[in-house]
């Protein structure tokens, strides 16, 4: 049986990152975690492009545009949606998730879901570099692995 898997060596990879400005006190920490992980795994700083969008709902369009250029081996999406008193949370989370997945499927470029969907600010803070690690860093590691796995299947 042949085993096919990616590795986490980022040398020669070009990575796009789409980050939401909404809740930037969280998303900036996710971005720092992602950038640090990419650099530690060999991606050069000049090979990382960051696009800022207003909110999580706007992430899929820019992720798809970045992926369509074929300039990037993977695109990382980072955002934070925190539940409020209305159903707005559900719409934003669902559409962001669907759009991000569709971006990957329609372009063949790994588009990694790094959007936090939490009930509280505290949960978001925990996932942006405290108790629960940094989900931006995890998304970056997944991007490297998926970029390499995708390359190996071409």
From Swiss-Prot:
One of its GO terms (biological process) is riboflavin biosynthetic process. GO terms for molecular function: 6,7-dimethyl-8-ribityllumazine synthase activity. It catalyses: (2S)-2-hydroxy-3-oxobutyl phosphate + 5-amino-6-(D-ribitylamino)uracil = 6,7-dimethyl-8-(1-D-ribityl)lumazine + phosphate + 2 H2O + H(+). The active site is at 88 (proton donor). It is an enzyme of class 2 (transferase). Belongs to the DMRL synthase family. HAMAP family: Lumazine_synth. This is 6,7-dimethyl-8-ribityllumazine synthase. It comes from Bacillus licheniformis (strain ATCC 14580 / DSM 13 / JCM 2505 / CCUG 7422 / NBRC 12200 / NCIMB 9375 / NCTC 10341 / NRRL NRS-1264 / Gibson 46).
